[in-house]
């Protein structure tokens, strides 16, 4: 546990004490901005240290402006993954097309680093956030919130509310403390949300897929590239973020109902994934074997969190805890960064009641727009039927295949001799290729880009890696987001 004084505090009033549960992305980002606005911040995290490693994630659109204002953009640019090739394979392991990843992913790529989207390892982002704030706030590792108690306050009209005069927190480690506000930044399966709003099922929107992600030895000589195998309803991908001796492996499959029981048991999880890919070819059998032995395996369902409100009394939610968009949108990290920025800015000169209301008013439409990206590109990129798969492959070929690598490494892992292209219904979407549709029309060789890869990138100040909201909602978000910059300048 460390604590130092805030570098600069422009306020003369006593600093309000706040607790943030979760030290992933949203938590440290929120801590940074609340500290900037004069709050005394404590962050509690159940892990023993800041979590490192993790799969690649995107930082794009408005989130780029947030990290620039935090001063960590240069560090993230240095950590940029720079994927150079995306190879699509058919059910037999044969190459369908090899294209520029930015064409498929819809990211903004160009010579100007100010507008170029970033792809970094999750651990590189969390490390940058932690480093930016660790000397200015208190961190409690190896601990978590056990209970939250908001004293009930009665008004003159006889109505009761949870606003009270603070939040009494009991930690699992046995400590007890009082805070002016508490924030849940504890992810998709948030305990903070459950304690305040009830079971996760009330807000959980299952999207029809299950996925597994883990690392395995890079025995394929892959470098800065992605390889994805498809059959209807199933996808397997290998993602080499550099020249490392390991690659990220993804297995995704469609399932009509969430396998709730299997997710509670690690061995049942592995059996579930193995059964879904029992007849798969290419390198999938080897991936299944590696999954069995992986010590960093993560298996879950693809889902969103949708809530009618993000706060109760003096407690508010941010990031995945409030509005997880799912990895199918590619916006989870960016929404966490932008949401933290907007929440802190809303509290810069307001009490919790007015601040939480402003947070929702100015951010909700932006969140909804990003969550609704689901389904815009996945049907074309990850088809559910054999006919749709063939149509997708034809469109990929129209993009123009990149020339073969000039070295002597294999262009792809050798296909399994007994591979078959069968599969169950539905479709799966690995995070190595999210479904954004923002790439400008036209490919590098001048060929016409299919409509599912097309779309002019909107103004950076109004997007989070997606289309602008449009209309009053767009203007409201952009105006409020910009106003926070003026406030920051005034306080420096």
What are these regions (language model features)?
Residues 2-16, 78, 93-94, 311, ...:
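C-terminal helical "tail/cap" subdomain of flavin- and related membrane-associated enzymes
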Residues 49-65:
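Conserved N-terminal glycine-rich FAD pyrophosphate-binding loop of Rossmann-like flavoproteins
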